[in-house]
């Protein structure tokens, strides 16, 4: 099976891009970030390229490259463009594909469209990345509830951070969702340490079945 997987998070800056890089390398998949907001200092696609070890042709070009590091709806407004759903159809490519969203599920793309609306349209399995720090239970369960209300399939939750197994277990029990594993904070962080962590912490079959 050649999976197409959406990676989203309970919040911004939780390690979603690092996870996406690790997953793309783990599955030898292509990577696509539909909307990049903020171009100074490098993009998420360039970071994934460095951390995944994938060849350049596996890093698909963004549909929207916006200059301002802000919510996509605002970054697009500043650039004088509007993000439309029809422009965000999933690329038809051979092989597996990892798609990374921006921020969380309720991030607006324009005045009447949220990222979760796009995910519902795609109807692809979602990996929800959640931090392990204090507050994650509420954020994770709200995100699971939002996905379920839209009928979006959930592949499972990938936790990122230090080991807080009680929080992870209660989220998965109450949310009735699969625990995919936990990606620890890595120092140093490079493609070798990231792939080693994925091989230790995750099972490939959980993403392909």
From Swiss-Prot:
Catalytic residue positions: 33
Main location: cytoplasm
EC number annotated for this UniProt entry: 6.3.3.3
Stored CDD domains: DTBS (cd03109)
Reaction(s) catalysed by this chain's protein: (7R,8S)-7,8-diammoniononanoate + CO2 + ATP = (4R,5S)-dethiobiotin + ADP + phosphate + 3 H(+)
Residues where ATP binds: 13-18, 100-103, 184-186
A family per Pfam: AAA_26
Cofactor: Mg(2+)
Subcellular location: Cytoplasm
Pathway where it operates: Cofactor biosynthesis; biotin biosynthesis; biotin from 7,8-diaminononanoate: step 1/2
Gene Ontology CC entries for this record: cytosol
Alphabetical UniProt keywords: ATP-binding, Biotin biosynthesis, Cytoplasm, Ligase, Magnesium, Metal-binding, Nucleotide-binding
Binding locations of Mg(2+): 17, 47, 100
GO BP annotation list: biotin biosynthetic process
InterPro entries tied to this protein: DTB_synth_BioD, P-loop_NTPase
Subunit (UniProt): Homodimer.
UniProt family annotation: Belongs to the dethiobiotin synthetase family.
HAMAP family: BioD (MF_00336)
NCBIfam families listed in its UniProt record: bioD
This protein's name: ATP-dependent dethiobiotin synthetase BioD
Gene assigned in the entry: bioD
């Amino acid at each position: 099976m050649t999976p197409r997987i959406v990676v989203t998070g309970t919040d911004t800056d939780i390690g979603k891009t690092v996870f996406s890089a690790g997953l793309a390398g783990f599955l030898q998949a292509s990577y696509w970030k539909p909307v990049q907001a903020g171009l100074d200092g490098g993009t998420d696609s360039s970071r994934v390229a460095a951390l995944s070890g994938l060849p350049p042709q596996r890093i698909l070009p963004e549909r929207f490259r916006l200059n301002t590091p802000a919510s996509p709806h605002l970054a697009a407004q500043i650039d004088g463009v509007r993000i439309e759903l029809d422009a965000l159809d999933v690329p038809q490519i051979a092989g597996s594909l990892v798609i990374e969203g921006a921020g969380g599920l309720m991030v607006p793309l324009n005045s009447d469209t949220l990222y979760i609306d796009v995910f519902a349209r795609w109807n692809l399995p979602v990996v929800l990345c959640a931090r392990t720090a204090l507050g994650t239970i509420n954020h994770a369960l709200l995100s699971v509830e939002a996905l379920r209300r839209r009928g979006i399939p959930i592949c499972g939750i990938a936790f990122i951070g230090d080991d807080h197994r009680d929080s992870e277990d209660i989220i998965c029990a109450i949310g009735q969702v699969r625990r995919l594993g936990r990606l620890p904070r890595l120092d140093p962080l490079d493609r070798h340490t990231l792939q080693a962590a994925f091989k230790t912490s995750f099972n490939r079959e959980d993403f392909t079945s």
